Amino acid sequence: MAAGETQLYAKVSNKLKSRSSPSLLEPLLAMGFPVHTALKALAATGRKTAEEALAWLHDHCNDPSLDDPIPQEYALFLCPTGPLLEKLQEFWRESKRQCAKNRAHEVFPHVTLCDFFTCEDQKVECLYEALKRAGDRLLGSFPTAVPLALHSSISYLGFFVSGSPADVIREFAMTFATEASLLAGTSVSRFWIFSQVPGHGPNLRLSNLTRASFVSHYILQKYCSVKPCTKQLHLTLAHKFYPHHQRTLEQLARAIPLGHSCQWTAALYSRDMRFVHYQTLRALFQYKPQNVDELTLSPGDYIFVDPTQQDEASEGWVIGISQRTGCRGFLPENYTDRASESDTWVKHRMYTFSLATDLNSRKDGEASSRCSGEFLPQTARSLSSLQALQATVARKSVLVVRHGERVDQIFGKAWLQQCSTPDGKYYRPDLNFPCSLPRRSRGIKDFENDPPLSSCGIFQSRIAGDALLDSGIRISSVFASPALRCVQTAKLILEELKLEKKIKIRVEPGIFEWTKWEAGKTTPTLMSLEELKEANFNIDTDYRPAFPLSALMPAESYQEYMDRCTASMVQIVNTCPQDTGVILIVSHGSTLDSCTRPLLGLPPRECGDFAQLVRKIPSLGMCFCEENKEEGKWELVNPPVKTLTHGANAAFNWRNWISGN
């Protein structure tokens, strides 16, 4: 082929040639797993590797539905990639930020080719072959450019695909549906339909749940019922939004440059058919069950919640089913956030239509690999363990930590009256009061709204610092709220890390508590940098904060608080551009949300939800964010240390134990 000549070629991520079903199934059978269970695990993980299926089986060892033949649902979508996808994702973010979430945000940008249908686990590879056959058949006529025309109504905004390109795409969908029906064949399938058993309710959550909550039906399938889309082909931008947002959404949509090059990919996805009408939650924090009927949570876990079955859940709790384990139980709602519907879908295979220019100029090996159906997403895993470790270590990270226990948390707002003499001197009325207080220029009264750590709070902070030392984490810089309890916590953590002399604490008023929650009509009087240095805190006096202390306004609005935290996080991250270690931020419980969401590219949550979430954050609660340079975003990951859990210790009066009383 002459240099510069353009040829249409296809790339299909098909495992039939290089990795047949037996090669994936045999290792699982050799370990003693039943055939139907192994096939279920392979289908649930997209039939990628036996290792992933094995991990799924281990996670689901206590899943009450593990042995039930519940098939996955599958759908075929035409998805944009490249520059056009980036612009569409930008629209997704901006429309959500400016106009709130709507139904379109539940799924990634796509054109539906075939609605969801079921397929038996042992016949999933038939769908892969159907996708390949349909793609190969329409390869020569597939449009090199798909024209998109903007359409808007009072509740819908999207791009329509029409004309001859739409006809070819419909033919592709019809061919896939026909091939899938032929290859899947005829079978008798046993389906399990979810139904509530009268008189039992959610009490069945941990005792043979599936047998109690699912009713089996036998259905004769003459073919795999795949229905190609017969409606106007469309790529939805917004759906079921508020009418007053229509104009803003249209302006954002018109800003999408449709001239960008795009590779269109036909992607086959699956989902769990039982949870189609459930809400999907994503765990933000780790949670260790306190009772047998509670779920274990790890950050990133997805939980399916049926809003109609929450009668027995206490306020602040929900009943859900973990996608990772299949187990059902209670979980604290404020440990989670709403996730998108498609976050739990599994991508199986894709057929990509691309324009390749000057293929002859490529190396032979490169060209052949792109045309031979290699599963390209797996190439990212080909790094050696050493390279992968180096890549992980090199990532910039932010660890946000709430301060330790405050004195006023235990002894109430009148704590200062309990530990001060009439002439203003401090004494220790209880062992949980600190041994001493630092000197303040205006005397002890300024501690009332800027309380110190309790003795237990000091102990908590040291435990956390010691655990961070054991984890091997490398702290490169430390930022703290100007509240005394936060600066104390930062100092104690650094002492346990043996870094108190090497790293100075940068005091950042921009991450101080939401001032609306502070007592009084003025902001509390906080210790100056000079007072902190006199009290033996290693303070960086050269640091110029994003928000000076004098700029803190009393009773600020929720939006003002969020804007303040966002601006502070921008400066904090940019202040350490060369550091690849961990940025430690010691602040208040509220900042675990207000300082991480800007990094994650998430808008502020509703004010009421924010207050509910913050109320449950314990002392030394942590959120850990890592920068993913490959994808150009930050991610919430497991904190480097475990949580600190302990119970209350009530006051004791020995006089109550005098004999006879």
Curated annotation (Swiss-Prot):
CDD domains reported in the protein's UniProt record: HP_PGM_like, SH3_UBASH3A, UBA_UBS3A_like
Spans annotated as Phosphatase-like: 395-661
Lineage: superkingdom: Eukaryota
UniProt keyword list: Cytoplasm, Nucleus, SH3 domain
Limits of the UBA domain: 15-60
InterPro entries for the chain: His_Pase_superF_clade-1 (IPR013078), His_PPase_superfam (IPR029033), Phosphatase_SH3-domain (IPR051710), SH3-like_dom_sf (IPR036028), SH3_domain (IPR001452), UBA (IPR015940), UBA-like_sf (IPR009060), UBASH3A_SH3 (IPR035634)
Cellular location(s): Cytoplasm; Nucleus
Domain spans labelled SH3: 276-341
One Gene Ontology term, aspect cellular component: cytosol
GO biological process, one term: regulation of cytokine production
Impact noted for substituting residue 317 to L: Abolishes binding to dynamin
Tissue and organ distribution: Highest expression of UBASH3A in tissues belonging to the immune system, including spleen, peripheral blood leukocytes, thymus and bone marrow.
Keyword Coiled coil: no
UniProt key word Nucleus: yes
Entry function: Interferes with CBL-mediated down-regulation and degradation of receptor-type tyrosine kinases. Promotes accumulation of activated target receptors, such as T-cell receptors, EGFR and PDGFRB, on the cell surface. Exhibits negligible protein tyrosine phosphatase activity at neutral pH. May act as a dominant-negative regulator of UBASH3B-dependent dephosphorylation. May inhibit dynamin-dependent endocytic pathways by functionally sequestering dynamin via its SH3 domain.
UniProt subunit comment: Homodimer or homooligomer. Interacts with CBL. Part of a complex containing CBL and activated EGFR. Interacts with ubiquitin and with mono-ubiquitinated proteins. Interacts with dynamin.
Name of protein: Ubiquitin-associated and SH3 domain-containing protein A
Organism: Homo sapiens (Human)
